[in-house]
């Protein structure tokens, strides 16, 4: 079961929490949900080069608070805050609520699964050898304290006639252990031969207490640390 489902969804309410944090009545729920989807689409399109890890949306009374987790906060903010004001106006066109933007720096992008997946996808688009891109990402993650990492690349890798899946793993990635802090990210590389999918799982240790905010708090404090013995599985 743990190998089939999204590891973040499996741990919601245990050591992970939702990226949209608000409550609404049945008449408003659909409208606010569509607003969230549009806000995420606009931000991901405008900030494609900013290394966006995730976007958290909270809705206090008549307000819309958006936290953008990024590896390059300077790109998001812009010169003298010009870009962030532009983003605030764009979001203001989507929602009637008062918009507040908060930029959160990702201190260790090498152990953020979404950023690692996007980085590998960009390398595949630049025709970097997929094995080299995967191994480089694995080595960087393990060097910065990850307990384990697994990377899957699927598609016409290297321009092959037949699509296949290649994977590389180092350390422990206990997907069945609910107390394990597993980060998961996906990205799509649009190559000349077609699309290639990239999936990344990163194990950052165990969270023993029942705390849905524990994983996010650990990331904000920069205290990501792996646990357990390391095992290497080198395919190619």
Curated annotation (Swiss-Prot):
Annotated region described as Disordered, given as residue ranges: 214-236
SMART domains in the record: KH
Top-level taxon of origin:
Bacteria
List each copy of the KH type-2 domain by range. Answer: 39-107
Sorted keywords for this record are: Ribonucleoprotein, Ribosomal protein, RNA-binding, rRNA-binding
Matching entries from Pfam families are given as: KH_2, Ribosomal_S3_C
GO terms for CC? Answer: cytosolic small ribosomal subunit
Query: Which InterPro entries has this protein been placed in?
Result: KH_dom (IPR004087), KH_dom-like_a/b (IPR015946), KH_dom_type_2 (IPR004044), KH_sf_prok-type (IPR009019), Ribosomal_S3_C_sf (IPR036419), Ribosomal_uS3_bac-typ (IPR005704), Ribosomal_uS3_C (IPR001351), Ribosomal_uS3_CS (IPR018280)
Its GO biological process terms?
A: translation
Any GO molecular function: rRNA binding
The UniProt family comment states:
Belongs to the universal ribosomal protein uS3 family.
Q: Which PANTHER family match?
A: 30S/40S RIBOSOMAL PROTEIN S3, SMALL RIBOSOMAL SUBUNIT PROTEIN US3C
Q: What does this protein do?
A: Binds the lower part of the 30S subunit head. Binds mRNA in the 70S ribosome, positioning it for translation.
The annotated subunit structure for this chain is:
Part of the 30S ribosomal subunit. Forms a tight complex with proteins S10 and S14.
Tell me which HAMAP family the record gives: Ribosomal_uS3_B
State the protein's name.
Answer: Small ribosomal subunit protein uS3
User: What is the originating organism of this protein?
Assistant: Parvibaculum lavamentivorans (strain DS-1 / DSM 13023 / NCIMB 13966)
| Gene that encodes it | rpsC
